[in-house]
């Protein structure tokens, strides 16, 4: 397809912003876990945010099946690298995915040293 449409098939994207500096949060470690039948968290995917604060290509629609997922952001390391002592060890988002058919999920996080907020954008996948 045309340039720029490659991400439409990417069912899970993470975007992280630095609310203090008004910039993308670069090189934030992201770990995704999936809840197993015995209620434990199994590692599912991981990566680091890019220069735009985004992380694409974590999984595929085939692997991203219905279930409960946890997205964990290593915010403490991010702030410490900037010489700031943050309050939280990490930021996490736990959610149920694909329970009514396949969707595309963007998990956005806005970080401050003592606060964070997250927003989920859920859309039907592009054909």
UniProtKB/Swiss-Prot annotation:
For the modification 4-carboxyglutamate, the affected residues are 42
Chief location of this protein? secreted
Question: Which chain regions cross the lipid bilayer?
Answer: none
Q: Which GO terms describe its molecular function?
A: hormone activity; thyroid hormone binding
The UniProt subunit note reads as follows: Homotetramer. Dimer of dimers. In the homotetramer, subunits assemble around a central channel that can accommodate two ligand molecules. Interacts with RBP4.
What's this chain's function?
A: Thyroid hormone-binding protein. Probably transports thyroxine from the bloodstream to the brain.
The UniProt entry's GO biological process terms, in alphabetical order, are: purine nucleobase metabolic process
Q: List the disulfide bonds.
A: none
Per the record, residues carrying Sulfocysteine are 10
Which Pfam family, just one, is annotated for this protein? Answer: Transthyretin
What is the protein's name according to its record? Answer: Transthyretin
Q: How is it modified after translation?
A: Sulfonation of the reactive cysteine Cys-10 enhances the stability of the native conformation of TTR, avoiding misassembly of the protein leading to amyloid formation.
Tissues expressed in:
Detected in serum (at protein level).
Family of the protein in this entry: Belongs to the transthyretin family.
Which key words tag this protein in UniProt? Gamma-carboxyglutamic acid, Glycoprotein, Hormone, Secreted, Sulfation, Thyroid hormone, Transport
Instruction: Give the record's glycosylation annotations as residue positions.
Output: 98
Q: Which InterPro entries match?
A: Thyroxine_BS, Transthyretin/HIU_hydrolase, Transthyretin/HIU_hydrolase_d, Transthyretin/HIU_hydrolase_sf, Transthyretin_CS
Q: Which residues bind L-thyroxine?
A: 15, 54, 117
Tell me which PROSITE patterns the record gives. Answer: TRANSTHYRETIN_1, TRANSTHYRETIN_2
For this record, the Gene Ontology CC terms, alphabetical, are: extracellular space
Location in the cell reads: Secreted
UniProt xrefs under CDD domains: TLP_Transthyretin (cd05821)
């Amino acid at each position: 397809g045309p340039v720029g449409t490659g991400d439409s098939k990417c069912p899970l994207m993470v975007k992280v912003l630095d609310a203090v500096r008004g910039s993308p949060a670069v090189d934030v470690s992201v770990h995704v876990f999936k809840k197993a039948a015995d209620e434990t968290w199994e590692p599912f995917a991981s990566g680091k945010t890019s220069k735009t604060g985004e992380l694409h290509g974590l999984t595929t629609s085939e692997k991203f099946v219905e279930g409960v997922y946890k997205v964990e952001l290593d915010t403490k390391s991010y702030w410490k690298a900037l010489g700031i002592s943050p309050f939280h060890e990490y930021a996490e988002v736990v959610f149920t995915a694909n329970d009514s058919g396949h969707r595309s999920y963007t998990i956005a996080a806005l970080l401050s040293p003592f606060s964070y907020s997250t927003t989920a954008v859920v859309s039907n996948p592009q054909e």
